[in-house]
A protein has these predicted regions:
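Cellulosome-associated attachment modules in secreted, modular CAZymes
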Residues: 8-175
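Extracellular and select intracellular beta-sandwich modules with Ser/Thr-enriched
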Residues: 2-5
Length: 175
């Protein structure tokens, strides 16, 4: 997740600062942030606690995105993830007991907009080290948006956070 806030300066510029976190709230210092405004952009460094800062022009439309390489040796994807994806694909609850938008986004492994048994199979293959057409990747989305309309048949979201006409303090949350 990326929590960003902008502070107004009298010099016609803003400082956009934030922190990149996982859905569970852990800082992700190995992630990278990209801040794009107008025709300019920057890749601020991310510190060990996951924070970053970038200067932007006041009044600009700004997009903040985050990315992070997936480390296959971390074994972060397990057969339980495959089981949960399979459960979601047939309308059952995952092992956590409740399904939310983040579960559907994570389960849509091939990113075709729906959760199916093929996603579960690819997750299972990946968890045991077999190759798949799609590689696992981190997805960072705007944590302030309402994703309650996401279902197993409609996994639609935009990467990053868009801030329009940033001319005063602004806050965005990217998970």
């Amino acid at each position: 997740a990326v929590d960003t806030s902008a502070s107004y300066f009298n010099f016609g510029s803003l400082t956009l600062s934030g922190i990149i976190k996982s859905v569970s709230g852990y800082a992700l210092p190995n992630a990278s942030a990209t801040v794009t405004y107008g025709s300019s952009g920057s890749k601020p460094s991310v510190s060990s606690d996951g924070t970053f800062a970038a200067d932007i022009d006041s009044g600009s439309d700004t997009t903040v995105t985050a990315s992070m390489d997936y480390n296959a040796s971390s074994k972060a994807i397990t057969s339980l993830d495959a089981l949960d994806a399979l459960k979601l694909s047939v309308g059952l609850k995952p092992s956590s007991g409740t399904a939310d938008a983040y579960d559907f986004i994570a389960a849509d492994f091939n990113q075709d907009g729906k959760v199916t048994s093929l996603d579960a199979l690819d997750i299972l293959k990946n968890s045991v080290g077999l190759s798949t057409t799609q590689s696992p990747k981190w997805v960072f989305i705007d944590g302030n948006k309402d994703y309650s309309s996401i279902t197993k048949n409609s996994v639609i979201y935009a990467n990053g956070v868009s801030l329009t006409d940033v001319s005063a303090d602004a806050t965005a949350n990217l998970k």
